[in-house]
Amino acid sequence: MTFAKRLLAGFAAILMATTAWADDHAAPEALPMALWSTYEIPAGAKPSELEVSLKEYLKGEEKRGFNNCAMYKHEFGSPRAFYTTCTFDDIDHFARIMDGSPSVASPDEVQLFGSHMDHIVLMTKQGMTKMPKYVLYASTAFSPHLNHVEMQAKAEEFYSAYDEGFGECNRYEHAWGPELAFYATCGFESYADFAAGVNKVMKIFEGRLATANLNILNHRDDILVKVMD
């Protein structure tokens, strides 16, 4: 299956999920999409300068029409970077924002960050009720021989352990950008909370997932700390 077909299959699966309700049931509320951006802290730079610049940038993005912008910073994992997120209702909302006004950043502005990445993702499950102090950010890509529906099923099987361990997790999948992957973000307020969550997750990994055929191609876990919400 080509990239384009997988992308269309993902949108189709979400559309079917929202329309396959009987007439006597209310359809579930549509979940937002999100723009995730990563701004690497270059060697020798002052993270505080980049942080101030990005805070002003995000305030401007909310004025442009994005919803609920927030920023987190690297704590454990890679790369050493700031991670920003802004939500929007759907791709048409995104188009109105992008066509309606220019970005706050000036084309002549000095670039304070190193490498940079933008990624549009679809939220598929919302478990967080607030922006937590810390976020466990998990990214998983599955074997390319799977079709998109099979990848979604594997992601559900794998990330269910995160849901059970940490309780408050959001789920996302790729919509547009640099990688075809599935994501979980789980919140916690202290490293004691993190340890408690990990202990629960590891029991699941050592139990029902120990022999599960998950077809994982690559995986990473990062810990991020809140800078702005």
What name fits each language-model region?
Residues M1-L8:
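Bacterial N-terminal signal peptides that target proteins for export
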Residues F3, T19-A20:
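N-terminal compositionally biased, intrinsically disordered segments and leader/signal-like regions
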Residues A9-A17:
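Bacterial N-terminal signal peptides
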Residues A22-D229:
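Short S/T/G/P-rich N-terminal loop/turn motif that feeds into the first structured element of a domain
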